[in-house]
């Protein structure tokens, strides 16, 4: 029987995992789907694909195509009876220096006060970034969607200025399946941190220890932070921390990052192992008399002896290099510079092991690790009863991922978000902001007049800087409110469910459900959305998502929509704005179909993702995220937009001889805009002022408003009507929606994929924007709307 045919509510045992893609097969094994593992079918997505299973204490989603490669045996009904937990002692965890166990330590310690650097590593959704915030006081983005940490983040440990820590991306193993796994592994190998802080979710130790064993093989000083211990005890579980510490050979400190409990003790242990270079006391996890007769043990030790000199030269730990060669890791193989005879000898050793063990190399390694983990957990862990968080998540999912309720609920939630943002909360706060800024501008103008300030200087200050920057700042409340809602959806765990629900739809466009989240984040800001594509395991998926994300209307375009829709469609402002969002989505879908059949033609990408429990978003985290976005927006207003406003005012005020012009059509700006205007004339807005506003919008979309404000002297409906009709204003908005978001977004594309793709994205978006705007304009003429 195959996994894709297992009935909901049934249990079965994995017999084998088959796949032509060895990297995908290894990833499936790393996620815990090894032969002998019991799985429970939880549900199918509303459209029948993908499916959700439960194994090793957590939920995993994968597509039916991939599930069909997993053979099952022993199908039976799920055991729902109560579980009786054995008691575990409550021996107090010894303070630093009180314990009897000590890992391998260097003979001389690093001097007090010498710089120390730590790597913070762990699975996704284990509280890693929350711990990073507690350690450093830094306000990073704490989310509950797999892969929220997409770049390197550094901070200094509080009260220890000599100690810094880097928050690495959340990963499940050190196999090079995703870019994040490669980044984390190379950081530890190349930058050689003084110690690793490995954070483990105590509610699912079995799953988290898989990465821990691989980190230990790197033979670096290390301390384990056993997080969420408060949830374990609250749900009837227990962990013998002292025994766990002894079995692993690494210091283990119980903490609760969310409650800031145990952080001080963790820091003390981390500083200690770093200063004394205390490496793990254990690197070998396969017993010489194991169930395979010691075949894997002999294999790894044989390879280690063969490659020891190469590993030392390449600065790669020998044990780690040996296991990676068994896996067939190409990056490690290349780094070791092995000759053909050595490679043949290694392959012979591995083939002999497979014959003796009766299984393939990847399954043998995964079985070895999970077997060791099972023995450890069996001795020192009492699994908690089903947690309240999981019970709550199952109940909520009946609605949010239900067959008939998932998509309607999603539409209601997103509709509510946009309605509250544009029509209720954001609009009310925007009105207050407009009144305040208008009062400031009027007071400044009156003050400068009373002071007798030169008219040109007063025009620069009032008409240029204050009016231009102020017109953009009035949209700050809308942007902050939108980010607040997006943050709540992400931190609660709902974003992951959206990816699960939407996967089948996106697959028709050549994407996976995981692409949905970066594109949804793109409604807030394109830059972090593009950066978050780094979490996607497939290069095909990643590049496609980067190409399409800019079509999702970012919050920086909101001021432009709000201004023109409010001026020309006062009775239908919200519907007009929503229609723009829908156009962006439709164009993105069409572009995806075209790209998937041309530039990015290929096989569908896998969809394998953990579904975290729902959690109440942290008020502090949500508010601080909103503050960070507000701060970024204000900084942009007073830097980029300020500079753009001054430049636009200067070009609009003077002619080529630097004389003040009486007619703006004679200005430097008019000359520059006139060069581009003919290209835009077929779209209905060949006015040089419109083309100038679009050019400055490439710096920052908010600059479109400040430019129009400076050029028109006001942004009232009367002033705007001198340049647009309602119809041409809408076509202008369509072009604004689809052409490149800003220089920062193009820079993010360059950073992620290189200059060639950045140029391609820019050219692609300009072309699509022109074509769609031309179609809308032509259709309007045929319908008599022009």
Residue ranges of model-derived segments:
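Hydrophobic core segments of alpha-helical transmembrane domains in multi-pass membrane transport
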Residues: 409-420, 482-487, 565-567, 581-595, ...
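Alpha-helical transmembrane helix bundles of large polytopic membrane transport and channel proteins
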Residues: 223, 233-385
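Conserved G1/Walker A P-loop phosphate-binding module
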Residues: 92-173, 191
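Conserved C-terminal guanine-recognition region of P-loop GTPase G domains, centered on the G4
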Residues: 160, 185-252, 560-561, 565
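Juxtamembrane inter-helical linkers in multi-pass membrane proteins
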Residues: 435, 439-443, 496-524, 601-625, ...
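Extended, low-charge hydrophobic alpha-helical regions
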Residues: 356, 360-364, 383, 424-465, ...
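Core alpha-helical transmembrane segments of integral membrane proteins
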Residues: 400-500
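Transmembrane helix-loop junctions at the membrane interface of multipass transporters and ion channels
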Residues: 551, 555-578, 744-754, 775-786
